[in-house]
Structures are given as structure tokens and as C-alpha cells.
Design a protein with these regions (language model features):
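FAD cofactor-binding and catalytic pocket of flavoenzymes
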Residues: 1-54, 110, 120, 127-134
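Conserved FAD/dinucleotide-binding core of flavoprotein oxidoreductases
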Residues: 53-61
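Secondary-structure capping and boundary motifs in well-ordered enzyme cores
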Residues: 67, 96, 116-120, 129, ...
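Internal hydrophobic alpha-helix adjacent to the cofactor/substrate pocket in enzyme cavities
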Residues: 75-82, 148-153
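A conserved FAD-binding loop/helix module that cradles the flavin
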Residues: 135-153
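Active-site Gly/Thr loop motif
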Residues: 85-119
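Extended C-terminal subregions enriched in glycine
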Residues: 68, 73-76
Length: 153
């Protein structure tokens, strides 16, 4: 609704007074797959059970940034055409659907499992979550994730 970090009595008053004239737009696009994005295990840090904690490494692809900037421009144009007077470009939502850590591929050199989720190297082991997706679509992946194990032998 407003710039990040905005808070306090004046902000609250402005939001409440203008609430009936506010709108929000959520624009979602595909994150391009990158081989260097990964989840590894920390060398020394452990969780409460003594297991290594995960370390997520994620860099945005230049197309991701270009797509976001395009969405900001087009979203602002929609609001301006509707008579809006203010638009704010908020940072990306800090939540993700982690995908691609056990990528689906035609062979073991390029990924972990095949189209049915069966792993290339370990017989009768199936990947049944979003980690087999090579990339994410512009929609929430939950229904597709639920469908994956239904089609597994």
C-alpha cells in the first residue's frame, strides 16, 4: 500500500481515510532457472536436532528483474488510466516456493529424476514435491505438486 518502512499514527490515519480508494495489484512471473541457485547444508551450524541447517543461494536472473520492472510500469499505467494518483513499487514478497533442487530431466547428467518422479540413480525412489520442477510458472504450484504423486506408479 505504501513505501516499505512506513508506520505510525499519520500513516495509519492516511490508510484509514483513503482505504475505500485503495487498490493493490499482485504481479507474478516465472523465475528463470539458474544452475548456480541451490540449497546446500551448512558446514558447521546445526539445528535443534543436531542436523546441518540448509543454506539457500538464490540470484535473480536478469530477465526476472526486467520482468518485474515491466510489471511495475504496466501496473502503474493501469492505475493511472483508472484515475489513480499514487503508485508504489514494493519489493518482492519475501516468501518463495523452493523449486528445482531435484530437477526433472531426461538423464542423470542433467537432473535427479525423470517425468514420473522416479530417480535416475536409485531404484524405486520417487520425488513427489516441487523440487523436481526446473522452474516455476506464474501460478502457485500447490495443485501440480499434489498431482505428481497421483500419477506415480
Amino acid at each position: 500500500i505504501d513505501t516499505p518502512g512506513t508506520w505510525g499514527r499519520d500513516y495509519t490515519r492516511e490508510v484509514i481515510e483513503n482505504y475505500r480508494n485503495m487498490a493493490g495489484m499482485w504481479l507474478v512471473g516465472e523465475d528463470m532457472p539458474q544452475a548456480d541457485n541451490r540449497v546446500t547444508l551448512h558446514d558447521t551450524e546445526k539445528d535443534q536436532y543436531g542436523l546441518p541447517v540448509p543454506v539457500v543461494h538464490f540470484d535473480e536472473h536478469p530477465n526476472d528483474l526486467a520482468m518485474r520492472n515491466h510489471a511495475y510500469r504496466m501496473g502503474s499505467a493501469v492505475y493511472e488510466a483508472a484515475g489513480g494518483s499514487k503508485s508504489y513499487e514494493l519489493p518482492p514478497f519475501p516468501g518463495t516456493h523452493n523449486l528445482g533442487t531435484c530437477r526433472m530431466s531426461g538423464n542423470a547428467d542433467e537432473g535427479v529424476c525423470g517425468p514420473s518422479g522416479a530417480t535416475h540413480d536409485i531404484p524405486n525412489l520417487f520425488i513427489s514435491d516441487g523440487s523436481q520442477f526446473t522452474t516455476g510458472a506464474a501460478e502457485n504450484p500447490t495443485l501440480t505438486i499434489v498431482a505428481l504423486p497421483i500419477r506415480q506408479p
